[in-house]
């Protein structure tokens, strides 16, 4: 089980190897409550960082999974979702996705299909958790059947950022699934992107006179990932 232990500022990040870091992205229409959910989960133990260059907000969090310290980067869209599409860099090396809709606005549920299609274009295998937010407005929605999650065999969470219902469970499960994905399977999309990156660097080096060349290209270790449950 994943649980909050300490603030990132209190952790000696240098002691953590690369496997102790995961990236979790949030998707969904504007105003469905993505940021509010993160703030509810992290409460006072977060320091959101606005990255205007990439039009996103980054939330850092520290969790413990099976006795191991995990540094978690939660990526929020910061308004970019109003264009109904995200830049490819938003998806790059993400280990799990939290996809949110507002139970009071049917259009946000209908748009899940478009978000999911784009997600799978860049991250074909990562775990995706579907979130029905704002159930505090009408608890009866928890009795409804949302076929989108069933169609793609995705876990569905009924939550409320307002009163905290199921928020901790949602994020703890997302962290656990992200860690499992990273540790247990290979994501070929990352391999392809890395190969293209290396190829471009090699091409650039070929264009530079021998006497001006310096440094070397390091091949990163393979990132593993597993079929999500």
Curated annotation (Swiss-Prot):
Organism name: Pongo abelii (Sumatran orangutan)
The similarity annotation says: Belongs to the small GTPase superfamily. Rab family.
Q: This chain belongs to which protein, by name?
A: Rab-like protein 2A
Pfam families per record? Ras (PF00071)
- Asked whether the keyword Nucleotide-binding is assigned, the reply is yes
* UniProt xrefs under InterPro entries: P-loop_NTPase, RabL2, Small_GTP-bd, Small_GTPase
Q: What does this protein do?
A: Plays an essential role in male fertility, sperm intra-flagellar transport, and tail assembly. Binds, in a GTP-regulated manner, to a specific set of effector proteins including key proteins involved in cilia development and function and delivers them into the growing sperm tail.
At which positions is GTP bound? Answer: 28-35, 76-80, 133-136
């Amino acid at each position: 089980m994943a649980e909050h232990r300490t603030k990132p500022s209190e952790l000696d990040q240098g002691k953590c190897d690369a496997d102790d870091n995961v990236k979790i992205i949030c998707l969904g229409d504007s105003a469905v409550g993505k940021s509010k959910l993160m703030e509810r989960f992290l409460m006072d133990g977060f320091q959101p960082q606005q990255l205007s260059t990439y039009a996103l907000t980054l939330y850092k969090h520290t969790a413990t999974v099976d006795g191991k310290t995990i540094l978690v980067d939660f990526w929020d869209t910061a308004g970019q979702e109003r264009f109904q599409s995200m830049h490819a860099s938003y998806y790059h090396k993400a280990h799990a996705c939290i996809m949110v809709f507002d139970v009071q606005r049917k259009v946000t549920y209908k748009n899940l299909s478009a978000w999911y299609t784009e997600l799978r274009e860049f991250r074909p295998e990562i775990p995706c958790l579907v979130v029905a937010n704002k159930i505090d407005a009408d608890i009866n929605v928890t009795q409804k059947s949302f076929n989108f999650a069933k169609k793609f065999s995705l876990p569905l969470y009924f939550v409320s950022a307002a009163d905290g219902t199921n928020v901790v469970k949602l994020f703890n499960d997302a962290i656990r699934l992200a860690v499992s994905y990273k540790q247990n399977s290979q994501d070929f999309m990352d391999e392809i992107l890395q190969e293209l990156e290396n190829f471009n660097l090699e091409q650039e080096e070929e264009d530079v006179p021998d006497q001006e060349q310096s440094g070397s290209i390091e091949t990163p270790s393979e990132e593993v990932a597993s079929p999500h449950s």
